[in-house]
Amino acid sequence: MLKRLVILVFVCAVILVVAISPRGVEARKQLTVNRQCCDFSPLQILRMTAREAIGGVTYPSEIGQDKWVIGRMFPGVSTGFFLDVGSGHGTIGSNTKALEELGWTGICVDPFPSHMEGRTCRMERVVVSSAAGRTVKFHTHSGLGGIADSLGKWKAEAEKSPAVELTTTTLGRVLDGANAPSFIHFLSLDIEGAELEALRGVPFDKYRFGAMAIEHNDEEPKRSDLLKFLEEKGYRRVHSYKQDDFYAPR
């Protein structure tokens, strides 16, 4: 009875904030996002909105990937490990900054990172593919850069930026070099069309992932190929929202 009363008071407080507080407009936006982004239960939606609207907690990710990890997949976990491939800007749009603020550690992978001040992840300034030692042409566009042969939806925009030649490595080598744990709680993968090639460089018999957010940008057959590949590795798609598919072990 007491638990139900506490939940009722909590729900009423959130509704009050959303309805009439000075933060109401922003809170309503947060409520809408939380209803759609992360496969939350109704109570989880309210809790997440309360953290943002009342508690002032911020989640920098573009479409709620960090909220999904924190609120849906690993609630209460403060010692998780992540692999952020295509980490880009260290704060704006980051899928892993909020995890670090909870105490998580991890690896950030990006050949041209920016604004990493204050971040604690091990920074690997490399380009990853299915095999190491390949020379690739890489467009350096901030946020949309990637391997020239793999660029998809934003190719025309990315090609406006300078291109450089880089030598590939694999995610397996990155993980081995960092002495990463065999269980990685969260993989964030956003490298503008080269996601499947990067995954082919992971020794899945050595490393397992508890949750994955992988960008697809509605590009076919890339999206379907990603799904098939990950299903063969023992994962299932548990959620989709905007440009990302979300995976967990079967």
Feature locations, PLM:
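Phosphate/nucleotide-binding beta-alpha loop and adjacent structural elements of enzyme active sites
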Residues: 2-250
